């Protein structure tokens, strides 16, 4: 059964890849749609698939992709492939994401990054963004024979082990190590404060110990500074100042520079090696390394998420939005207790008004009417429809509060007014048609949040 599932997933990934230009030096898919994660939102079958495409020539690749998949891009597509590539390379973490795409029956997002930018990130941890993704188990779909890229991928894993060693005690378990490694790219990530599940790292590691072991096993076996008892799942490392100095000297260049910046007193201007020697003798060496990681991750995560406001989301046709339904108010609004609806691509109706087209609808809703009577059974009945061609159920509600959502760093508000064709499978509305609804949505959300 496991082999059959693996083969089925591989076929799915390859079919999705066939929808894009072929000139890829590396393509991989990651996240909860590929590897199971613990936690309440762990529906792997319906989870979004997250792809990253590495390309040698981003301008040429975006040019071809715009011809094949024009609807995947935000309004920035009208500026052309050169501007898109400039935004990709010069803002955020060097990656351009198109999100909320229905492809081959699955909801996906995909990021595009230059091969040179990726190699720099893997070797030096300039942003620790895609490099951080590649420190956790991913499914590589295709990779070319570029020796430099393959060497950088291996170097990134070894650097992750070294950084984790510096933040761990003298002896620890495999799980402790993998939790530290998985958390490297989340150190200082502002999304862990404002949006992400605080147990995200644990949810990634615990169900996937075997995958982490497969990724790092040979590196641990060959590392001269660790005693790896693989049968017991236990490790011991050299925590002497000499051992820590050796490890600090092999860290990626950007992390070394950040540590130097943190520890170098004003006016001293010590070189990096001198600072690292001091840190190696410091009892708080691990905390200093963690601060250095935060200094890399925090700004890159903020820049990338800010860029995502402009790059994420395709054209207004064929939308996928998560709706947060508000508490019941005197004028007949519906309560959903902060749980979510996710719809993508076949007709979805609210109060008789066509809102979108949804081929898959996923719920975990407990709705309530005044007086406390729940209507979850009826709600589930209305939404438990997965037929791709006939979806005509109308939800039994009067009005829905304007939607607001954070989906994979994309943010969008739409006021649910009497918009007869917010989208259709064959055409997208003009900006003039949609703009009043969008403005009403932003205004209502502003009023709602100002009240609180």
Curated annotation (Swiss-Prot):
**Involved pathway(s):** Phospholipid metabolism; CDP-diacylglycerol biosynthesis; CDP-diacylglycerol from sn-glycerol 3-phosphate: step 3/3
According to the record, mutating residue 86 to P results in:
In COXPD56; uncertain significance; compared to wild-type, only partly rescues the growth defect in deficient yeast, when tested on respiratory media at 36 degrees Celsius
Instruction: Tell me the lineage of the source organism.
Output: Eukaryota, Metazoa, Chordata, Craniata, Vertebrata
Q: Name one GO biological process term.
A: cardiolipin biosynthetic process
Q: Which reaction does it catalyse?
A: a 1,2-diacyl-sn-glycero-3-phosphate + CTP + H(+) = a CDP-1,2-diacyl-sn-glycerol + diphosphate
Q: What biological function has been recorded for the protein in this entry?
A: Catalyzes the conversion of phosphatidic acid (PA) to CDP-diacylglycerol (CDP-DAG), an essential intermediate in the synthesis of phosphatidylglycerol, cardiolipin and phosphatidylinositol.
Name of the protein: Phosphatidate cytidylyltransferase, mitochondrial
TM region positions: none
Q: Where is this gene product found? A: Mitochondrion inner membrane
Superkingdom in the source lineage: Eukaryota
Q: Which GO terms describe its molecular function?
A: phosphatidate cytidylyltransferase activity
EC numbers: 2.7.7.41
Mutagenesis or variant effect for residue 137 to L: In COXPD56; uncertain significance; contrary to wild-type, unable to complement the growth defect in deficient yeast
Enzyme class name = transferase
GO cellular component annotations of the record: mitochondrial inner membrane; mitochondrion
Which cofactors are reported in the record for this sequence?
A: Mg(2+)
State the family it belongs to. Answer: Belongs to the TAM41 family.
Q: Which disease is it linked to?
A: Combined oxidative phosphorylation deficiency 56: An autosomal recessive mitochondrial disease characterized by lethargy at birth, hypotonia, developmental delay, myopathy, and ptosis.
Report membrane topology: Peripheral membrane protein
């Amino acid at each position: 059964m496991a082999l059959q599932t693996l083969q089925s997933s591989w076929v799915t990934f390859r079919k999705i890849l066939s929808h894009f230009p072929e000139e890829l030096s590396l393509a991989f898919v990651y996240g909860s749609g590929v590897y199971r994660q613990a936690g309440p939102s762990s529906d792997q079958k319906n989870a979004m698939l997250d792809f990253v495409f590495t390309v040698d020539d981003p301008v040429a690749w975006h040019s071809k992709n715009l011809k094949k998949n024009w609807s995947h891009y935000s309004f920035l597509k009208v500026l052309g492939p050169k501007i898109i590539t400039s935004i990709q390379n010069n803002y955020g973490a060097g990656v351009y994401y198109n999100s909320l795409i229905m492809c081959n029956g699955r909801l996906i997002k995909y990021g595009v990054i230059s091969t040179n930018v990726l190699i720099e990130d893997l070797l030096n941890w300039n942003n620790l963004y895609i490099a951080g993704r590649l420190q956790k188990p991913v499914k590589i779909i295709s990779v070319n024979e570029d020796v430099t890229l393959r060497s950088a991928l291996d170097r990134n894993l070894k650097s992750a082990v070294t950084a984790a060693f510096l933040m761990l005690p003298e002896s620890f378990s495999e799980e402790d190590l993998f939790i530290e490694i998985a958390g490297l790219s989340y150190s200082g990530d502002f999304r862990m404060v404002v949006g992400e599940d605080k147990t995200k790292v644990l949810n990634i590691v615990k169900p996937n110990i075997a995958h982490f072991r497969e990724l790092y096993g040979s590196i641990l076996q060959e590392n001269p500074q660790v005693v790896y008892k693989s049968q017991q799942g236990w490790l011991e490392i050299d925590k002497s100042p000499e051992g820590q100095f050796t490890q600090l000297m092999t860290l990626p260049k950007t992390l070394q520079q950040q540590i130097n910046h943190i520890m170098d007193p004003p006016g001293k201007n010590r070189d990096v090696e001198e600072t690292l020697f001091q840190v190696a003798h410091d009892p708080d060496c691990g905390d200093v390394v963690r601060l250095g990681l935060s200094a890399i991750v925090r700004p890159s995560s903020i820049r990338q998420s800010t860029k995502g406001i402009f790059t994420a989301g395709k054209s207004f046709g064929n939308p996928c939005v998560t709706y947060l339904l508000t508490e019941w108010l005197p004028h007949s609004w519906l309560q959903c207790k902060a749980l979510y609806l996710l719809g993508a691509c076949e007709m979805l109706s609210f109060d008789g008004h066509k809102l979108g087209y949804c081929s898959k609808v996923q719920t975990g809703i407990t709705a309530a009417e005044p007086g406390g009577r729940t209507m979850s059974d009826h709600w589930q009945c209305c939404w438990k429809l997965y037929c791709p061609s006939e979806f005509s159920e109308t939800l039994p509600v009067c009005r829905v509060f304007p939607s607001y959502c954070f989906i994979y760093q994309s943010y969008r508000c739409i006021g649910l007014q009497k918009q007869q064709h917010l989208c259709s499978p064959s055409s997208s509305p003009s900006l003039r048609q949609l703009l009043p609804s969008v403005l009403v949505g932003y205004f209502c959300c502003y009023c709602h949040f100002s009240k609180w």
